[in-house]
Amino acid sequence: MNKKTIVVKFGTSTLTQGSPKLNSPHMMEIVRQIAQLHNDGFRIVIVTSGAIAAGRHYLNHPQLPPTIASKQLLAAVGQSQLIQAWEKLFAIYDIHIGQLLLTRADIEDRERFLNARDTLHALLDNHIIPVINENDAVATAEIKVGDNDNLSALVAILVQAEQLYLLTDQQGLFDSDPRKNPEAKLIPVVEQITDHIRSIAGGSGTNLGTGGMMTKIIAADVATRSGIETIIAPGNRPNVIADLAYEQNIGTKFIAHQSDRLESRKQWLFAAPSAGIITIDNGAQNAILEQNKSLLPAGIINVEGRFSRGEVVKIRTQSGKDIALGMPRYNSDALQLIKGRKSADIENVLGYEYGAVAMHRDDMIILS
């Protein structure tokens, strides 16, 4: 049975449990749940905060000015401590992890997007759990409130996840600030993220991390618009991850816009002018339009323009009609060499391969 793909984002407050350092017993409990789901067949991706807190603790809480450079220093020192903590705990269950350090630019740049996506899918296909963090040590503008909330939404789109869990120190989204109003009520389900929902999100957060409730609402908006159900839930609740995966009602659930699932992803992917043209034969045209298939090198007749792997190009028929936009797996130089050839010849011709297809069907949008 194919189980769903879930992205789980852990805020600093969840990993530290209010202390100035990573809370190992709590992380052990988190890993136990993820190991259970992993062994049950779920595909789990972790987006982890905590590098800055880990770095501050490792350096014995140095007095540093509140600057970008100070945060980068702490992140550079703390990232190795953070990944070691995850690695040691997963090793108890004989589960391997793979670290990816990303910035938003890595996902917005199409060639790097493809590389990141291929790496993530390779890890998941080989039963390795990806552990992702913002590359705070080299990022500049990216170090701001909500980095990993927003990053987790983009990662969820990247891996085509069914669900995104944003685990935090709050029970979910309330109709007012529960720390100020004891009568505040938890909102169990949000059908649509409206201005009213944004207005009640407030500005919660701790000085250990960089996140708050408003950034989670923004992340939920991005994810649900791409067809990904998003849940804000308490990271300290016993068995919260496993219970969410098995569909218990916890926290605040943001309903996915299922009708827009594929289209919104493609709008996100293809918001760029075309960099070239790939002309295809009648067989490839039929495969794409009638059979919903990917484009193989054998079906390519001509390649126009100079473009990189992952840039948007037009797919044109022999009669001159543009039938699709898409992101090729290979750059223009490589496609010139493999056009008209069988997929089995790719590695022999190029000396490498990014798979058997020139352009995957998931990376195309058909033009009406």
Swiss-Prot record:
Gene Ontology biological process: L-proline biosynthetic process
Residues noted as binding substrate in the record, renumbered to the chain: S49, D136, N148
Alphabetized UniProt keyword annotations: Amino-acid biosynthesis, ATP-binding, Cytoplasm, Kinase, Nucleotide-binding, Proline biosynthesis, Transferase
InterPro entries associated with the record: AceGlu_kinase-like_sf, Asp/Glu/Uridylate_kinase, G5K_ProB, Glu/AcGlu_kinase, Glu_5kinase, Glu_5kinase/COase_Synthase, Glutamate_5-kinase_CS, PUA
Any one cellular-component term (Gene Ontology): cytosol
Pfam families hit by this protein: AA_kinase, PUA
Chemical reaction(s) catalysed: L-glutamate + ATP = L-glutamyl 5-phosphate + ADP
Primary location recorded for the protein, binned into one broad class: cytoplasm
Pathway: Amino-acid biosynthesis; L-proline biosynthesis; L-glutamate 5-semialdehyde from L-glutamate: step 1/2
SMART domains according to UniProt: PUA (SM00359)
Residues that, per the record, bind ATP: K9, T168, D169, T210, G211, G212, M213, M214, T215, K216
Location(s) in or outside the cell: Cytoplasm
Transmembrane feature ranges: none
Family the entry assigns: Belongs to the glutamate 5-kinase family.
Function: Catalyzes the transfer of a phosphate group to glutamate to form L-glutamate 5-phosphate.
Name this protein carries in UniProt: Glutamate 5-kinase
Organism: Haemophilus influenzae (strain PittEE)
Name of encoding gene: proB
